[in-house]
């Protein structure tokens, strides 16, 4: 009888534990706020009769209410996340958030959406994505999509492929993926990325430069059809390139690609990208290659890194620098490696 009662009690506990209303998430507050909250908790848990014991719980309020600083109107913040051999870039404006690509899936289990992107969204206090851009359907760019959709609602998506069809197919092929959208979560609106499509958010302009409307996939090459997005704020600009190659770069340059402060090096800095035309047209101050440590492709190619450096750009690479962050402000453009600015003991030295 006791075992039966225990089993029933555990059923109720498991049900409560899985309910959405049973827990909530808060943004990652600075350590002094956490220390203050822990001190208040220790005070509140003292024995009855301890002076002002219950007031200790009030010390937790700053931790629960803290929100990270957001950019001012016309400014933006970028996080080129460290997802290994793949791509995931978070762009924040004053009130909105955009994710460009969702990182790779790990065949040993898990994906970048679950392991990297969702925790970053939580740490930044982001409970909703206004825009999700999936540049193309390669798994190193879309492998974490279903985990992202399970973590936060997405108002609309842009992609160079049919996102709804891809999600259905992926659910059939990977039914056991954690957070895999068993409830069928999809973006509220799913659109194609097409050259000339543009919108504004908080004084920041987002414009697709590639592919052209109705353009067929070149030779069946998904890379060539990648969405290319330019982010233009009041002070600085950012170019997100997917996996386009030299041919598409030449097309962008011929169409009058404006100078750009930060460029995500196309195709992880492969030897078949970051051609002279793109490098010369962009005139970037910073180039970022998202690639995995000791990846089998040899990304980024040494010649590509030299090309950007010779053009005067600082060259960042996630296999060496980890996540690369940037903040565009009226006072200037601040770009840094998270690993260097906020070093942890588990980082190699």
Listing of model-derived features with the role each one plays in the protein:
Residues 1-349:
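Non-globular, low-confidence helical/coil segments that flank catalytic cores
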């Amino acid at each position: 009888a006791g075992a039966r009662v225990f089993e029933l009690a555990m059923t109720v506990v498991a049900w409560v534990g899985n309910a959405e209303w049973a827990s909530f998430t808060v943004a990652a507050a600075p350590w002094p706020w956490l220390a203050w909250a822990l001190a208040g908790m220790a005070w509140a848990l003292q024995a009855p009769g301890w002076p002002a014991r219950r007031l200790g719980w009030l010390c937790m309020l700053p931790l629960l209410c803290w929100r990270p600083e957001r950019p001012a109107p016309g400014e933006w913040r970028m996080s080129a996340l460290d997802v290994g051999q793949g791509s995931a870039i978070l762009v924040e404006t004053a009130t909105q958030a955009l994710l460009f690509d969702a990182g790779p899936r790990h065949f040993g289990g898990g994906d970048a959406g679950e392991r990297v992107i969702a925790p970053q969204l939580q740490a930044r206090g982001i409970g909703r994505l206004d825009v999700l851009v999936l540049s193309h359907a390669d798994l190193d760019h879309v492998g974490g999509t279903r985990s992202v959709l399970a973590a936060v609602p997405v108002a609309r998506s842009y992609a160079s492929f049919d996102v709804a069809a891809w999600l259905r197919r992926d659910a059939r092929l990977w039914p056991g993926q954690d957070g895999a959208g068993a409830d069928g979560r999809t973006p509220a609106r799913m659109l194609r990325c097409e050259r000339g499509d543009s919108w504004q958010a908080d004084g920041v302009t987002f414009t697709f430069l590639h592919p052209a409307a109705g353009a067929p996939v070149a030779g069946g090459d998904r890379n060539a059809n990648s969405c290319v997005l330019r982010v233009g704020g009041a002070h600085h600009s950012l170019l997100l390139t997917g996996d386009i190659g030299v041919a598409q770069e030449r097309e962008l340059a011929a169409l009058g690609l404006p100078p750009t402060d930060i460029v995500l090096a196309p195709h992880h800095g492969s030897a078949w990208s970051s051609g002279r035309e793109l490098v010369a047209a962009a005139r970037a101050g910073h180039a970022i290659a998202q690639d995995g440590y000791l990846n089998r492709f040899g990304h980024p190619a040494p010649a590509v890194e030299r090309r950007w450096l010779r053009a005067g750009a600082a060259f960042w690479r996630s296999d060496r620098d980890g996540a690369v962050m940037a903040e565009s402000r009226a006072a200037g453009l601040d770009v840094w490696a998270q690993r260097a600015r906020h070093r942890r003991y588990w980082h190699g030295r």
